Regions:
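Polar low-complexity intrinsically disordered regions
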Residues: 1-3, 10-22, 196-200, 321-332, ...
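Short, intrinsically disordered low-complexity segments
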Residues: 3, 32-34, 212, 293, ...
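Aromatic side chains
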Residues: 25, 40-43, 117-118, 340, ...
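Non-heme Fe(II) oxygenase catalytic core, chiefly the N-lobe of the double-stranded beta-helix
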Residues: 13, 74, 78-307
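Residue-level preference for alpha-helix termini and adjacent loops
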Residues: 39, 90, 140, 172, ...
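Catalytic core of Fe(II)/2-oxoglutarate
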Residues: 310-311, 315-401
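Fe(II)/2-oxoglutarate
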Residues: 2-103
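Small/flexible residues
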Residues: 6, 35-37, 67-68, 215, ...
Length: 401
């Protein structure tokens, strides 16, 4: 059995404040950084995954590998939890009292979710991010221990009432994958077919989102044409090429927009916690992504057929082995920057970034000060197998500034 906790004593800079101390309290001297050893699943293939290779998501691919890695408990660090930002770290932690009854009956009531929870969460994003528009694409509920009960069928997009924790390191979309979903929206049917027209959004919100979406796509198309990239080319059985699929996001002058997940536990998390990667740390710049291109058919409110792309996280090069981890030598850390919130409560809401057009614009200017996305995954800690099943929810939300 893996050891559950590894305690490391570090000397922290004197100007750090404690996330567990009153405002203004300065930690003196030693700070104990708490880490656990977690079990992580990675895609470990060296090539580009084949189109629609859903065995990677199902966990049956021969290229998937399990690694035992250290995970830092954010509560043990001197950094206040409220100071993490999606622009610097890839994620934020927002405190919000539960806006709805978190009972299973309540959260599985579609009308309660769309008419009460959705508006509360989009208002939260407008408040904390300063976005002028935020629209929910969909939500997922995770409240079963594993996939054995329902079977995993990624082709239907997990359109089932209860899901298990998703335990493979990933970010939901590559930049082209996020744009693929955004461009697939079919006007004017999208809100009606996703049951978010009545009670979930207002007439001005819907009109603003669709108008800004058209402006965004027009600005992207101008930048793509200026870069000399030809139109998108689709050949059955092959990954798409051209158009926004070959564009790096630079020289875009339209409204800034992003794609986020709002991740919340309905009860205090006792097992299968969510790990997030701190993208502000230098080691995170070495993370490699494997693009898993997928086809989507007959999705509500979308064009009949389109492509998107998931970003599967590869293990760091020094770590490509069947299991375990090795301490680094020569001062160069090889440990991924995984962290988590121990016993995360329903009031502690993660905001995870999937995509940010501004990050790509800055990258095109040679600036690396804004994070594009946040890798994340459920992971397992030995000894927690018999704890209550994790009950959680994630909303995928478009934000436009």
């Amino acid at each position: 059995m893996l050891p559950r906790v590894v305690d490391i004593v570090e000397i922290m800079a004197a100007d750090h404040t404690s996330s567990n101390a009153p405002d203004g309290f300065i930690d003196a001297g030693l700070v104990r950084r708490r880490r656990v050893i977690g079990s992580f699943n990675y895609y470990n293939g060296l090539g580009t995954p084949a189109l629609n290779d859903l065995t990677i998501i199902e966990g049956t691919s021969p290229d998937n590998r399990r690694y035992d890695l250290p995970v830092t408990d954010l509560r043990s660090l001197p950094t206040p939890l409220s100071s993490y930002t999606h622009e610097k770290h890839g994620f934020q932690i927002i405190h919000q009292p539960l806006p709805i009854d978190p009972s299973p009956t309540s959260v599985h009531d579609h009308k309660i979710m769309t008419n009460q929870y959705y508006p509360a969460m989009t208002a939260l994003l407008r408040q904390h991010l300063g976005a002028r528009c935020s629209i929910v694409r969909k939500h997922s509920l995770r409240d079963i221990p594993d996939w054995n009960r329902v079977g995993m069928n990624p082709e239907v997009g997990f359109e089932i009432p209860s899901l298990a924790p998703f335990s493979i390191a990933h970010s939901d979309y590559t930049p082209a994958g996020a744009r693929g979903h955004f461009r697939a929206i079919r006007e004017p049917d999208w809100f009606v077919e996703n049951d978010t027209e009545t009670g979930s959004t207002t007439d001005p919100e819907r009109a603003s989102f669709l108008r800004l979406r058209r402006e965004i796509i027009a600005a992207e198309d101008r930048a793509i044409a200026a870069a000399g990239i030809g139109p998108e080319v689709y050949v059955e059985g092959r990954r798409p090429q051209g158009g926004h699929w070959d564009w790096d996001g630079s020289n875009y002058d339209g409204p800034r927009y992003g794609f986020f997940s709002i991740w919340r536990a309905w009860e205090t998390v006792k097992r299968d916690p969510l790990a997030v990667m701190d993208m502000s740390l230098p080691v995170s710049s070495r993370v490699e992504y494997a693009p898993l291109t997928r086809t989507y058919k007959n999705r509500p409110g979308c064009v009949p057929f389109y492509y998107s792309e998931n970003a599967m996280i590869r293990p760091l090069a020094l770590r490509r082995r069947d299991s375990g981890y090795e301490e680094s030598h020569g001062g160069d850390t090889a440990e991924p920057a995984w962290c988590y919130l121990s016993e995360q409560t329903p009031e502690e809401v993660y905001l995870l970034k999937f995509y940010d057009s501004e990050a790509l614009v800055r990258r095109g200017r040679g600036e690396e000060d804004m994070r594009l996305l946040c890798p994340h995954t459920a992971f397992q800690i030995a000894g927690q197998e018999n704890e209550p099943v994790r009950r959680s929810c994630e909303l995928r939300v478009w934000c436009i500034w």
